[in-house]
Amino acid sequence: MHIPDNYLSPQTDAVMAVAMVPVWVHCIKKVRATLDREHMAFLGICAAFSFLLMMFNVPLPGGTTGHAVGGALIALLLGPEAAAIAVSVALALQALLFGDGGVLSFGANCFNMAFVLPFAAAIVFRALNSRLHDKSWGTPVSAIVSGWVGLCLAALCAAIEFGIQPMLFTNASGAPLYCPFPLSVAIPAMLIPHMLVAGVVEGVATAAIYGFIKKTAPSVIVGPEAVDGQLAAEGAAAKKTSLVPTLILVAVLVVATPLGLLATGDAWGEWDAEGAATAVQEAGDDSLQASVGLDTPTFADALPTGDYLQAYSEEQGLGFAGQAAMYILSGVIGVAVLTIAFRLISLTVKENGAHGDGRAA
């Protein structure tokens, strides 16, 4: 779901970036007003969860791959505004340091994964959990459904962004300048696999990690359950809370990241030039195949050659062990950068934040 540069027009990139500005402004104000120093530092751990979950690629129907995002998880832990900030920072790190996702398309990727996903998940979770929280299975089911809905809506938004490109941007001969797949192709190609697999992974990961943190460190949760008073008794009963189990979980995820290498194939809409040409040819549509002609400056001619780690691994001829080591190293770097960055930011926040009625919505 990381849209690379050149798949969307500069105009689309600009519109999506502008659309995210008020979202970021609102979320920053909300987070600074509601999170104290402890929770601001914990937000860095949450951003690390998002960064790591996006490294676990899973095979999807059709031979493509996908991944969870973690936006729903953070929305349940700290609220959707905090999730928007955490996922945005994780996406920026991936784009700038690892070449995963475009720089120009950063606004679009944030709109889909840092805005639509966590806010939709928070709305769904509150609607379901308000009715089911008194049942032992209520909160886990609410978390699974909220994660599934959030990721599927994010995938739908990405599909629409892909699909409108050939409608709006073509060259003199009528060939698409950017993503050549129309809505009739992009929506089912993106939405169905995410509904069947990736959305389920997002939901299960959300429920599992949220339940784990709820048992080991309930005091850090200030999301929808806390706002709605559904955590009051549990929080009061927890005399001691520790982030050590959570940090151990982060370490386990870092070591396990090479599992993401087992899923072969590119994510739909994240091909390099060669992969894009192959995808167009496999579509069996002559008008689409015209968009990759060598005699015109079409979208495929300007596409990146893949993420930095993949390119380096191929250049060095690394085997699975070498690629696994690179993957773990990138996970360590990502987690370190995110936790240190938010720890430094937390130093600018007051020791005791306002966690009353103004907590995450």
Where are these regions (language model features)?
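Aromatic-rich transmembrane-lumenal/periplasmic boundary elements in polytopic membrane proteins
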Residues: 252-307
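Hydrophobic core segments of alpha-helical transmembrane domains in multi-pass membrane transport
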Residues: 16-29, 49-54, 119-122, 147-162, ...
